Amino acid sequence: ANPTFGFTPLGLSSDAN
């Protein structure tokens, strides 16, 4: 849940968000 994107790419929970 920590993609390279700072936002939610596929609506998944992003740690970088």
Curated annotation (Swiss-Prot):
This is Major Gly 50 kDa allergen. It comes from the Eukaryota. It comes from Glycine max (Soybean). Keywords: Allergen.
